[in-house]
Amino acid sequence: WYSSMFAANIKQEPISHHHHHHHAHHSRRQHPHDSNSNSNASSPHQSPLPSPNPPSNTNLQLEQYLKHQQQQQQQQHQQQPMDTLCAAAMTPSPSNNDQNSPLTWPGLPNPMQSIMPANLRPSPNTTTTTPPAAAPAAATIALQANDKLQALTPPMDVTPPKSPAKSQQSCAEPEKEHDLMSNSSEDMKYMA
């Protein structure tokens, strides 16, 4: 969610390189909506905790941080290649936070940690419980599907023997094949 906001910032910033300050203000005015939509869109990932509500509160804090950070980042943006910033912003890593200045450490991780660990605690529990349950289920389903496929494939394997049988019949009756071939070739000649 934080990284998605920064990704949105980064996507907008290359456009705003020449009009950094004007564009940045516009983008910041739009950002509560963008970040809210991002947080709501990504809240399923973060589990529907009161994550939509904290973002609305933290967005104000975040905007203040972002205003400081963006001013710093705008300088960094012009210095650093975009890829490194994208990678740094996509992964809110300690190095990224260090780059963004210590403002993020006291500031962002508090809303982030208040939201994330609460989300991460249920989600690992649910994920760890469900994927093992889901994975064996998926595995068994896949195995069943494979069994069904294998059960279906023997008919498929049985039909090729039929086609050799047909080929044997055609070999036994080569004239029909030649007639078919000649007819088709003649039709092709006529068609041509």
Swiss-Prot record:
Main location: nucleus
GO molecular function, one term: zinc ion binding
Subcellular location: Nucleus
Signal peptide: none
Keyword match Repeat: yes
Extent of Basic and acidic residues compositional bias: 173-192
Region annotated Disordered, chain positions: 16-59, 88-108, 151-192
Stretches with biased composition (Polar residues): 92-103
Keywords for the protein's UniProt record, in alphabetical order: Developmental protein, DNA-binding, Gap protein, Metal-binding, Nucleus, Repeat, Zinc, Zinc-finger
GO BP field: segmentation
GO cellular component: nucleus
Amino acid composition bias (Basic residues), ranges on this chain: 17-31
Keyword Metal-binding: yes
Biological role: Gap class segmentation protein that controls development of head structures.
Family from the record: Belongs to the hunchback C2H2-type zinc-finger protein family.
Identification of the protein by name: Protein hunchback
Gene source species: Drosophila adiastola (Fruit fly)
